[in-house]
Amino acid sequence: EISLIDHSQGAIGLRFFGLGPNLNPTNGLNKLQRLLDRNAFWAKNRTINDLKKCLANSDVIVSLWVGNEIVGFGRALSDGVYRGVLWDIVIDQDHQGKGYGKLIVKKLLKAKKIKNTKKIYLMTTNKKFFYSQIDFKEVTTQELLIHEL
């Protein structure tokens, strides 16, 4: 059974109670940590406390479950008018190629805080073709700059 969950802003149920499908406690935060560790080189070794902060400060959070296992995740931030950013979109390697990534991205883009935003940004290392299938376009007139602490 597939469940696509549109969490409330800040994902309180997932953060504090580990809730998954049907509001059942599933140790969801630990499962999210494992999903990221196993499937996203850029998100390995995130601590539970950092994930809680990350979720608390996210505007839109979507998770995809097969039974009681989380197999997909994505989140977004937006000012609701001019700019938004999609973050941490990941699908478990055993579930790729099933359309789950598109489900998550489309759910994020339809969210109230995102749907009327003029420009939605995302960064990808090796999934440019995937995102181009969902109408994201490469921009060569801008450069990505990073300030790291």
Label each residue range with its predicted role.
Residues 114-149:
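Conserved active-site alpha-helix within GNAT-family acetyltransferase domains
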Residues 1-48, 142:
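Short amphipathic alpha-helix that is part of the acyltransferase structural core
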Residues 95-104:
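Conserved acetyl-CoA pyrophosphate-binding loop and the N-cap/start of the following alpha-helix
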